[in-house]
Regions:
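Extracytoplasmic "Venus flytrap"
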Residues: 41-62, 85-92, 114, 182-190, ...
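Conserved small/polar residues in nucleotide/adenosyl-binding loops
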Residues: 331-340
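Hydrophobic alpha-helical segments within soluble ligand-binding/sensing domains
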Residues: 94-95, 155-178, 191, 219-221, ...
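Sec-exported extracytoplasmic/periplasmic mature domains
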Residues: 62, 66-73, 100-108, 124-131, ...
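Beta-alpha junction/loop-to-helix N-cap segments that form part of ligand/metal-binding clefts
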Residues: 29, 33, 37, 52-59, ...
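Extracellular/periplasmic periplasmic-binding protein-like sensory domains
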Residues: 251-321, 328-329
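Short, low-complexity disordered leader/linker segments with a strong preference
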Residues: 1-39, 70
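Extracytoplasmic ligand/sensor domains, especially the bilobed periplasmic-binding protein
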Residues: 104-212, 260-285
């Protein structure tokens, strides 16, 4: 109950903050299209190390926008037209260019980005300078908490400052006495690895090594060999399921060095189950989410819309888009052009 209450309070604070920001923008040149159309940006890693996760995330956000449009209640019957862009998850320059394309296209707000590094780059270099509200459903780096965002960047996912502690608690509960840690070499990986390492050590668990890996390589046998030489009851893989993280796991299995893997949120999804199969039977991980009534309602709505909501951050993507819509609904304006 306390967790649910805290979440509701946090969501309310976000809505209020977004509304306050929007209400200061009435004199700005409109960013919406003609004929009651409001353009909204969706920027996620449609290519790259989490490309198997983002289609459902984008579809969930678009579902919220569609519901608002179909209701006829959005600012006198205005409709929302989503515009997609590719963050790549890992290439900040490409992500920034993609976000600039959304701004040029006239979006009023941005749902995204996904991975923490590109999210910070887009917020700092594009969203904040242009005064465009941005809500990420999945950027979890603790560093984003102190981002100089001028009050227009928000998240619907919890920080890894908490996520790393929870993953460490699960590790202890599973009876693991020693771990090797590998992390994707970016803000998300390093931030979560630091929190997780400190938390497992606080539980009395030995950390044999902490090493970074790069995404997009064809071979991870060298990384697997380094981790194998350090040893441990399990290998904690803090990374992405479609590239580096998967590669390290497969190389470790091929070498016979580990058979138990501890997975961060970026490692959880159907594609890695399809790729690795039963060799993951001893493995476990953690994923932010909710088990409350709202989660069940969303799952049913998503299913009806043909969206698989079982993957990470689908609900958070819907929530991020819905928060933008709610801010529009609650902001009294004579024209849809003044909404955002």
């Amino acid at each position: 109950m306390a967790k649910n209450k805290g979440l509701l309070i946090a969501m309310a604070v976000i809505v209020i903050a977004v509304i306050i920001y929007f209400s200061t923008q009435q004199s700005k040149v409109s960013k919406t299209g003609v004929g009651g159309e409001i353009k909204m940006g969706i920027i996620l890693g449609f290519t790259g190390p989490i490309e198997s996760l983002t289609p459902a995330m984008a579809a969930s956000a678009e579902l919220a926008f569609k519901e608002a449009s179909d209701s006829g209640s959005l600012l006198g019957g205005a409709t929302i037209s989503p515009m997609r862009a590719d963050s790549t998850c890992v290439d900040s320059a490409a992500a920034t260019a993609a976000a600039e394309g959304l701004i040029s296209g006239g979006v009023a707000a941005i749902m995204g980005a996904d991975c923490s590094g590109v999210t910070g780059a887009i917020a700092t270099n594009v969203a904040v300078p242009n005064g465009v509200v941005m809500i990420s459903p999945s950027a979890t780096s603790p560093g984003l908490t102190t981002l100089d965002d001028k009050g227009i960047f928000f998240r619907t996912a919890p920080s890894d400052a908490r996520g790393g502690q929870i993953l460490a608690d699960i590790t202890k509960d599973r009876g693991i006495n020693s771990v090797a840690i590998t992390y994707t070499n970016n803000d998300y990986g390093k931030g979560l690895a630091d929190v997780y390492e400190a938390a497992v050590k606080a539980h009395g668990i030995t950390v044999s090594t902490v090493t970074a890996h790069e995404d997009g390589k064809a071979d991870y046998s060298s990384e697997a060999a380094t981790l194998a030489s350090a040893g441990g009851d399990a290998l904690a893989v803090i990374g992405y399921l479609d590239q580096g993280g998967k590669g390290v796991i497969q190389a470790s299995l091929d070498a016979g060095s580990f058979d138990t893997f501890i997975l961060s949120d970026g490692m959880i999804g159907q594609s890695i189950i399809d790729a690795i199969g039963s060799d993951l039977n001893k493995s476990f991980g953690s994923l932010p989410g909710s088990t409350g009534k709202g989660a069940g309602v969303f799952a049913e709505v998503a299913k009806t819309a043909g969206i698989d909501s079982s993957g990470p951050y689908t609900g958070e993507s819907y929530d991020a888009a819905a928060l933008i819509v709610l801010a529009c609904l609650l902001y009294t304006s004579p024209s849809p052009r003044d909404c955002l």
